[in-house]
Design a protein with these regions (language model features):
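Surface-exposed, charged secondary-structure patches
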Residues: 6-13, 39-96
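Hydrophobic residues in well-ordered beta-strands that form the structural core
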Residues: 30-31, 42, 114
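Short beta-strand segments enriched in hydrophobic/aromatic residues
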Residues: 34, 89-91, 116-117
């Protein structure tokens, strides 16, 4: 894990916005966390590959009731203007997931540029 730095704290804050967006039903938090052109690829519980621009998921993710998400940062790695975060993600609505978020510092601001995930048992 990367030593704690201002960048580390900023990276964790951005990914925490993603988690909080689910629990607070807040589209604005997703928009703040993700780059507008970010994509998501994931393998669902049935083994199917899904891919789409991540912004298409914001309204569904923010729909009540709260997802009851518990997120645990498994690793945070940062080199220069790039970072990767591995997140254990468990929710009442969708079960367990392992998320991999790639981030870039763009004009001084950290943004998630893509997400890959796989469904896992609890």
């Amino acid at each position: 894990m990367t030593a704690r730095t201002d960048d580390y704290d900023a990276i964790v804050r951005v990914v925490q916005l993603y988690i909080d967006g689910f629990n607070d039903n807040d589209v604005g938090k997703f928009k703040e966390a993700f780059h507008e052109d970010a994509w998501m690829f994931y393998i669902n519980v049935d083994g199917s590959l899904y891919k789409n621009p991540i912004s298409k998921s914001f309204e569904n993710w923010a729909a009540p009731p709260s997802w009851g998400v518990v997120g645990r940062f498994m690793s945070v790695t940062q080199v220069g203007d790039a970072a990767a975060v591995q997140l254990s993600f468990d929710s009442e609505k969708s079960g367990g997931w392992i998320d991999f978020h790639n981030l870039l510092r763009i004009n001084g601001v950290w943004k998630i540029t893509n997400k890959s995930a796989t469904h896992c048992s609890r």
